[in-house]
Amino acid sequence: MDKIIVITSNIAPYRKEWCEELAKFYDVTIVYTKDHDYERDDRWLQKESKTCRILKLKNDKDRFDALCFDVIDVIRDNKDALIVFDGYGPKTNLLGLLYCRLKGRFSLVNVDGYPTERKKSFLKETVKRFVIGKLCTGFTASGEATKEHLLSYGAKEDRIIVHNFSSIREKQIAGRPYSREEKLEIRKKLGIQSEKQIVLGVGRFLPLKRFEDLIDAVLMCKTAPDLYLLGGKPEASYLKHAGDSDRIHFIDFVLPEQVDDYYRAADLFVLPSETDVWGLVLNEAMAQGLPLIASDSVVGARSLIRENGKIFRTYDVKELSEDIDLCLEKDNHQKMSAESLDIVRDFTIENMVRRQKPFIDAYFEREKRK
């Protein structure tokens, strides 16, 4: 069986799922550099797999930017394997990319998206152009917007696979939108007493997520929905913006397998980030039939939001509030819910691998002919 080595910083649940789908067709080893992530709960990370081998590189500091020199040993000892780097930013990945380039060895870089930065450093842009245009030899890209971004930095179009990035499997997609009665029943299970329409936000409570904008927008809405923010202990700024309102609710960390019930209980999902390289929570919300609203700084919104929601200008609280009211209007809501389910069926882990497999198989065929 042909071998693939995936080199990543840590093993996110969706990364493991993707590797395990690849493992149906290839011999896959996941090589990672750190056991912890200061921005995430350790319970979220994955360290075991039934179908992939897992190898930890030496990293005494357990940092994202640590330089693990033994990545060279892994690449050198697996001469027949296709090397796949999860991103081009980590130092260990850059070292591995440089080694592959010096040895004339093809590798793939998986690119989930890109930061939508408003201020750009000349030095950083120059280095990025060199890495993408000269150092990397092939890419798997999360969507068309990511592909265009890579092309703008010098990547070759015939070396890019667009795979419709996702964290969900086909079996996780609801067969139809949930009814009002079903949502109320799920709310009881979660201990939610509200019978109002619910707007949901999911993600780490970080400044760049702009959840304070969502709080302000919900409090301005004519439809007066409740807001549930799921992702940790609320920031002081969130509590200040919420004031004494009984419509704003904060939920601490929830395991991935429990989050779906919150999607099912809600009526609308909003991601107001000031930058987001993709936004996998959009995929997850769509899989449960939710309409979406996201800022124009969320890269995934450009692929996922069509007639199933709205994209608003980042930081524009008034526009966000108006969009929430529009999406919660009964006729719009029903149409958008059905549209979300139609769109997301093309964004699954199975489809990611289906799109990647012809490119990967062609690579191994070329190598065998040498």
Please provide the spans of the model-predicted regions.
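A short, histidine- and acid-enriched strand-loop-helix "catalytic/donor-clamping" loop
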Residues: 105-123, 135-138, 169
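Donor nucleotide-sugar binding/catalytic pocket of nucleotide-sugar-dependent glycosyltransferases
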Residues: 136-184
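Nucleotide-activated donor-binding/catalytic signature segment of Leloir-type glycosyltransferases, i.e.
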Residues: 237-254
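Short alpha-helical donor nucleotide-sugar binding micro-motif in glycosyltransferases
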Residues: 253-254, 261-266
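Conserved acidic donor-binding segment of nucleotide-sugar-dependent glycosyltransferases
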Residues: 306-317, 325-331
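Aromatic "clamp/platform" in nucleotide-sugar-dependent glycosyltransferases that forms part
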Residues: 274
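Short hydrophobic beta-strand element within catalytic cores of glycosyltransferases
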Residues: 291-295
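Conserved donor-binding/catalytic core segment of Leloir-type glycosyltransferases
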Residues: 193-209, 215-218
